[in-house]
């Protein structure tokens, strides 16, 4: 499922985006800032799918042609910006996938939406290139920059975007999600919640990880011997 209802926590972000949809006051540029695996891309996907939904509500219907395309990552007016180099988004990436493409009107939808994950990897030249588009975007364009380090982006980019900051999800919400949605046993859910620290993606990854038992045993061992360990040993263990 991919609706706002399926987003765990992040009530302020959900409210902001759904209010914008309801009022038809969509910004041309958004930044979603939060740590890795916190759910930034899922929120961006839901928002994009809702904007393009043919039924025009504040939730994607998941039944229309556009929603079905979006669910299979084949919606032509929702573009996921990629980069060949693992640690760098280059100026060529920006020019080829955004700047040279954005002037082409949407194929079949009201908006043309660009979603860029790991936006902090943009080089200074890439940031300056996208800045030119942010300064004078077409009326149908929506650019979503997802980042784990908002401070890596130019102040001039920040000033032209709506910045939405992810917050840690309450432990109880994470626990309920693991136990009721993923059928994770309660003892395992408790350990995952403790390690995830409000990061729903991290909790989900831990719960499904083959390394879970190793992590649990290491944690129990640390607790057992912590009184006999010096600070450097504790730091190394963590």
Labelled PLM ranges:
Residues 1-49, 69, 139-140, 149-238:
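Charged, glycine-rich active-site and insertion segments that engage polyanionic ligands
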Residues 2-125:
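Clamp-loader machinery-focused feature within the broader ASCE/P-loop NTPase space
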Residues 57-58, 144, 210:
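Short, polar/charged, Gly/Pro-enriched helix-capping and turn/loop motifs at alpha-helix termini
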Residues 99, 132-135, 179:
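A broadly conserved amphipathic alpha-helix scaffold signal in soluble, globular proteins
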Residues 118, 145-150:
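A short beta-strand-to-loop transition that corresponds to the Sensor-1 phosphate-sensing loop
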Residues 128-145:
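Conserved catalytic/switch belt of AAA+ P-loop NTPases
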């Amino acid at each position: 499922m991919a609706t706002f209802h399926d987003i765990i926590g992040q009530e302020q972000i959900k409210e902001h985006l759904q209010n914008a949809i309801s009022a038809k006051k969509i910004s041309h540029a958004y930044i979603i800032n939060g740590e890795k695996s916190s759910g930034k891309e899922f929120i961006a996907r839901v928002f994009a799918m809702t904007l393009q939904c043919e039924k025009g509500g504040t939730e994607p219907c998941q039944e229309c042609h556009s929603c079905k395309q979006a669910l299979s990552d084949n919606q032509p007016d929702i573009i996921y910006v990629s980069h060949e180099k693992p640690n760098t988004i280059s100026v060529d990436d920006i020019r080829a996938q955004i700047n040279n493409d954005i002037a082409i009107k949407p194929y079949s939808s009201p908006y043309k939406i660009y979603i860029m994950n790991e936006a902090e990897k943009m080089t200074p030249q890439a940031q300056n290139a996208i800045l030119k588009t942010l300064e004078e975007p077409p009326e149908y364009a929506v650019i979503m920059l997802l980042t784990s380090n908002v401070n890596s982006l130019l102040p001039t980019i920040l000033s032209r975007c709506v910045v939405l900051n992810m917050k840690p999800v309450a432990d109880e919400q994470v626990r309920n999600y693991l136990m009721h949605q993923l059928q994770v046993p309660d003892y395992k859910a408790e350990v995952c919640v403790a390690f995830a620290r409000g990061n729903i993606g991290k909790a989900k990854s831990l719960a499904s990880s083959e390394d879970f038992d190793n992590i649990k045993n290491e944690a129990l061992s640390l607790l057992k011997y912590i009184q006999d360990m010096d600070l450097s040993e504790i730091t190394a263990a963590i």
